[in-house]
Design a protein with these regions (language model features):
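Basic, Lys/Arg-enriched alpha-helical interface segments
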Residues: 1-92, 100-115
Length: 115
């Protein structure tokens, strides 16, 4: 099991997604609707992606692969990886991460719609 380290950008994005999902849950409870919103679904998918990433960064569902357009935050020669939060969706979300800074640590660099 890996320990996660978050960049300020990733922390802010995660908090914003969580707040939108909670607002949707509250609104749904007030209006007595049963169907979950897109914001709730997206947050659930992000949490699932993070869970898989912590337990196994090579989990087949993540479809993890190297991403060359972002610099590694700790090591210029290090690799940055992209994991799928969503698939086959317009503007599908991706999670960018790298190994480090310490042993058994992963850094979540960003959570963004597909670039």
């Amino acid at each position: 099991m890996f320990e996660l380290v978050w960049t300020p950008t990733a922390t802010a994005t995660f908090a914003a997604l969580q707040a939108k999902a909670q607002a949707s849950i509250d609104h749904r409870a007030r209006s007595k609707r049963a169907k979950a919103s897109k914001d709730e679904g997206l947050f659930k998918q992000v949490v699932k992606c993070i869970t898989h990433l912590r337990s196994n960064p090579r989990h087949p569902g993540l479809q993890t692969h190297e991403f060359h357009s972002l610099p590694h935050p700790y090591d210029k020669a290090g690799k940055v990886f992209e994991a799928y939060v969503q698939n086959r969706t317009p503007g599908a979300y991706r999670l960018f991460w790298c190994y480090g800074p310490g042993k058994n640590q992963l850094t979540v660099i960003a959570i963004t719609p597909h670039p």
